């Protein structure tokens, strides 16, 4: 069978780098051919972080960063292809998620905005780009997120197996695969790594809490945990999605103000428990038992995985590597898959997940010619 090569580009709310993957979809399961992470330069990272907060002169900043992020994504593609023997002419298309700078689907006229100019990516790589995947779903009344459950359904579902796929990036989201004719469900549970990353960056100037070691050295404060879990988002019915607009450093500082007597490591432990408890609460609402497979950066946090296992004794816990997909690259592979769906004219959203009025082909194509 002829190879079907696509590239997926993903940079999540953690902004910890641009993941680029080359995937072959010619077989029954996606085959990861090559992978690469392009670091986000500090000046660009600071600009993106500023753009995520309301300020003045946003249009000029947005325009510049849109091009800059497009150039960075193109660099990620070119460096990815330099690692393997696949020529750019063999790649059917790039699926670029872009970098989310606003996600506000619940306004009267909801919107989401990802930057990283696809015209720049196409021009600098010589490969057609498919991008802007989320806004069609929002135009149809949906949340525009999460989009990965459709990929999870095709890749991980098995008849007779009740499975949950948990993606822990900056925000955590779950896909419920019931193993029968029932509807696939999926939604954002709340913070994944975003708050634990923000706190260690603020206190220790470290990018993330490696293996959850700092959290493990602390003791969770139940009063603070209960206050954090009282956020209205956690009691919302699905479909629902969230982002840094709700769970950010400003919100965290506001929540911490009555708890300034706590040790810094105790706060870190409590924030990790916020992630774990909010995930576990939503999973238990779906089913008390089944198989739970984790992907995203959280899959490599041993302390997080231990705490999740303790909260979900009825679940067999593993990473998606047990199903043949490297947890580090799962989301990048999903956006390569979304590019393939667009190229073939096939729908890629699940209305039961996003709340859209119907299925739709997602994304627009930007030619390299």
UniProtKB/Swiss-Prot annotation:
Q: Which domain of life is it from?
A: Bacteria
**What Gene Ontology terms for biological process does this UniProt record contain?**
1,6-anhydro-N-acetyl-beta-muramic acid catabolic process; amino sugar metabolic process; peptidoglycan turnover
Keywords for this protein: ATP-binding, Carbohydrate metabolism, Kinase, Nucleotide-binding, Transferase
Q: In which pathway does it act?
A: Amino-sugar metabolism; 1,6-anhydro-N-acetylmuramate degradation; Cell wall biogenesis; peptidoglycan recycling
Q: SUPFAM superfamilies given for it? A: Actin-like ATPase domain
Q: Name one GO molecular function term.
A: kinase activity
Reactions accelerated catalytically: 1,6-anhydro-N-acetyl-beta-muramate + ATP + H2O = N-acetyl-D-muramate 6-phosphate + ADP + H(+)
The enzyme's main class, written as a single word, is transferase
Q: Which residues of the sequence carry a binding annotation for ATP?
A: 12-19
InterPro entries the UniProt entry points to: Anhydro_N_Ac-Mur_kinase, ATPase_NBD
Please give the family membership noted in the entry.
Belongs to the anhydro-N-acetylmuramic acid kinase family.
PANTHER family, from UniProt? ANHYDRO-N-ACETYLMURAMIC ACID KINASE (PTHR30605:SF0)
**What role does this protein play?**
Catalyzes the specific phosphorylation of 1,6-anhydro-N-acetylmuramic acid (anhMurNAc) with the simultaneous cleavage of the 1,6-anhydro ring, generating MurNAc-6-P. Is required for the utilization of anhMurNAc either imported from the medium or derived from its own cell wall murein, and thus plays a role in cell wall recycling.
Q: What is this protein called in UniProt?
A: Anhydro-N-acetylmuramic acid kinase
Gene name in the database record: anmK
